Amino acid sequence: MKRVWVATLSVGIALIGLCMYFYGYENTWRLWNIPVFKSPFLDIQLITGTAESLEKGFDPTVNNPYDPGHRIFNYPKVWYLFLNLGIGRRAAVPLAIASLVLFFGTLAVFPKPKDKFAILLLTAVTFSAALMLSYERANVDLVFFASTVIALLLLEVSAPASFLVMILSIVFKIFPLFAIGIYLDKRKNKLPMYAIGAIAFTALYFAVTWQNMKHIFSTTQKGNDLSYGLMVAFDYMEATMGAAFSIPSIVPYALAFVLLGLAVYFGFRQRSQLTDIDLRNLRAFWAGAGIYVGTFLLGNSWDYRFMFTLLTVPALAEWVRHKGGGAIIIARITVIALLISCWYLIVQKWFGTTNAAYNVVYAIDEIANWTLYFGLTYLYIASLPQWLFDELHNFLIRKPR
């Protein structure tokens, strides 16, 4: 089935290219209801524009005039090693193409689809509106999807090499830390030490660069549309209703952590044979689910980050076809929620033609995002190997000598 997946992916990319050639660049993106900017690959231009601002003597964390949107540069300081290489706005298109090639190349390689249903689901997510948004913007997360996949594949050859790729990803973008589930295994071994090492490294990294991290979080654009996260719906209601909508800021966090606790509890109570799938697909699920749940808890994340849910698809495609069990029902609901979330822009285009209809479609999307959050957390816990729970139990009941 691997060849079928690669062929399907290639045909999909070729069809988009042909559509752009005959129908037009902007018109093609609008088929998915993607907001198109005059300047293509807008997100990669944050990097090339910042490099040019830096070269001209500006501090891009305060004033970034060579970025098309004059956006403040809010990446970790280590990015300056790359920015000082002399890249400028002319490099935007080559960098965008390289990012897309890297993304689609690793996407072609990593999954082990079991059947045609898995390929259908992979295709539906790959060419969904949420992911088309990431391609149109050429968002840098395309590179970090690739680095996560590379870390996953290297683990089958060299754990230290995989760990090095993971650490570099964390240094440049932080959130790949949530993918450390790739260092789990069906059988007990020493690989989880790499996950512990990644957590320890990140804690030290935060301690050393704390002021930079605070600046990053405070200046990151937080959307209330084309976004997912625990704050998104509440920010939207506050923006549309104004003073009529006022709740304590703790409420979204309380709701998210209550759902998290319930998902962990029921996932633990109803563990089943979810580990009875290919190990690579299982590790990919832990990585993708970890990134979605982790970034959801950060508050606001743009929809292009749904690209990481691709990592969950091969496992989900197998689980939904299993027979019986609460975990299988949750897996099926999770797949439905994933498809609704990824295709939200299309649903909005078709049905959100009035303010009232738009709000209904928006509400459906938010319900899907929260359902996906619960479902992926539940399945993450339910799919963890039994030896891990045994080790945790032994650690908790261990008596001091």
Identify what each model region corresponds to.
Residues 1-161, 186-303, 310, 388-400:
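Primarily membrane-embedded glycan-assembly and transfer machineries that use lipid-linked glycans
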Residues 96-101, 167-168, 309-310, 325-331:
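Short alpha-helical "patches" and their helix-cap loops
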Residues 132, 164, 357-360:
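Residue-level detector of alpha-helix boundary/anchor positions
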Residues 146-157, 182-187, 310-326, 372-383:
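Transmembrane alpha-helices and membrane-interface helical segments
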Residues 164-183, 298-308:
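Transmembrane helices and adjacent periplasmic/lumenal helix-loop junctions
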Residues 317-401:
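Aromatic-enriched
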